[in-house]
Amino acid sequence: MLVLGIESSCDETAAAVVNDRREILGEVVLSQLDEHRPFGGVVPEIAARSHLAHMDKLVAEAMRRAGVGFADLDAVAATGGPGLIGGVIVGVMTGKAIALAAGKPFLAVNHLEGHALTPRLTHDIAFPYLLLLASGGHCQLLAVEGVGRYTRLGTTIDDAAGEAFDKVAKMAGLGYPGGPAVEAAAQGGDPARFTLPRPMKGKPGCDFSFSGLKNAARLLIESLPQPLSAADQADVARAFQDAVADAMADRVRRGVREMKSRWPQTQHLVVAGGVAANTALRQVLVRIGNETGLEFLAPPLKLCTDNAAMIAWAGLERLRLGQSDDLTFAPRPRWPLDPTARKGAKA
């Protein structure tokens, strides 16, 4: 099987061709970082216009690199949500047009499902597994029971981890995007100088919270001489990164206990999403895996951030089950993975 994937839910425009042997035959990702950096975050209107300007040639380049034509495809998959709706519309309409013209099935892929199934693109693992999905817009602990079968064990009750990284980096003058900037600065930081709170640590359940930590970091930054010296930036970054990793570790340990109780056959703890690229977080998760007897797996760094290979793979997984979507599918700004999510829940 051969599937073209299209991703345009935020600030990466991407296209990829993937086969059922877990091979990425052709892949192109165009980042919009330079367009959004002056604003310190993603501007939806700019993102949508950039997707529209570049999508066609990126699809053509991915197909060229794969050495295939549209007639060779078995299906076309595009992110159908959740995400910034302008960009999602661009990707969905492009995917529909190609599918219609080539006479191929169309699959609207949940962006979160793309992340959730990425470990099966990079590793030969069976269901179920415990997934920590941490990105700029999402922070969830999910029991991945199968394609289209997800149980949310925990979620953020306010801000996502990646959003907190971006805001703290901006307040500390570290630049954008915040995740890599904080991690780079933290490498030279003194872990003993500042201590920030560990939100939700020790509390029942598996939910996350980062709003209070973000505010504590703001108060710390404002208490220091302005503008921050390089040493102060490094120490603040280290304190913040350590707090995030420690708080998330507590939630994940609780998630492992619940996972083993409800799905005792679980063998893997996996992480996906842009925050999964953080080395400190990965080190903590490796330790948790060793402590609990679960094998820790993480996709390569390039597949942690938004990409089209994961969308193609999720589409391929659905296609193998005989699934496809009608061309009347409407793009969705919110689209929770688990069907029992409360109304209004963050996707």
From Swiss-Prot:
Biological classification of the source: Bacteria, Pseudomonadati, Pseudomonadota, Alphaproteobacteria, Rhodospirillales
GO biological process: tRNA threonylcarbamoyladenosine modification
SUPFAM superfamilies: Actin-like ATPase domain (SSF53067)
Family to which the UniProt record says this protein belongs: Belongs to the KAE1 / TsaD family.
Organism (species): Paramagnetospirillum magneticum (strain ATCC 700264 / AMB-1)
Free-text comment on the cofactor: Binds 1 Fe(2+) ion per subunit.
UniProt catalytic activity: L-threonylcarbamoyladenylate + adenosine(37) in tRNA = N(6)-L-threonylcarbamoyladenosine(37) in tRNA + AMP + H(+)
Stated name of the protein: tRNA N6-adenosine threonylcarbamoyltransferase
Main function: Required for the formation of a threonylcarbamoyl group on adenosine at position 37 (t(6)A37) in tRNAs that read codons beginning with adenine. Is involved in the transfer of the threonylcarbamoyl moiety of threonylcarbamoyl-AMP (TC-AMP) to the N6 group of A37, together with TsaE and TsaB. TsaD likely plays a direct catalytic role in this reaction.
Alphabetic keyword roster: Acyltransferase, Cytoplasm, Iron, Metal-binding, Transferase, tRNA processing
Binding site for substrate: L133, A134, S135, G136, G137, D166, G179, N278
Residues binding Fe cation: H111, H115, D306
HAMAP family documented for this protein: TsaD
Source domain of life: Bacteria
PANTHER family: TRNA N6-ADENOSINE THREONYLCARBAMOYLTRANSFERASE, TRNA N6-ADENOSINE THREONYLCARBAMOYLTRANSFERASE, MITOCHONDRIAL
Record Pfam families: TsaD
Cofactor(s) demanded: Fe(2+)
Residue stretches spanning the membrane: none
GO cellular component term of the entry, any: cytoplasm
Main location: cytoplasm
GO molecular function, one term: iron ion binding
Location(s) in or outside the cell: Cytoplasm
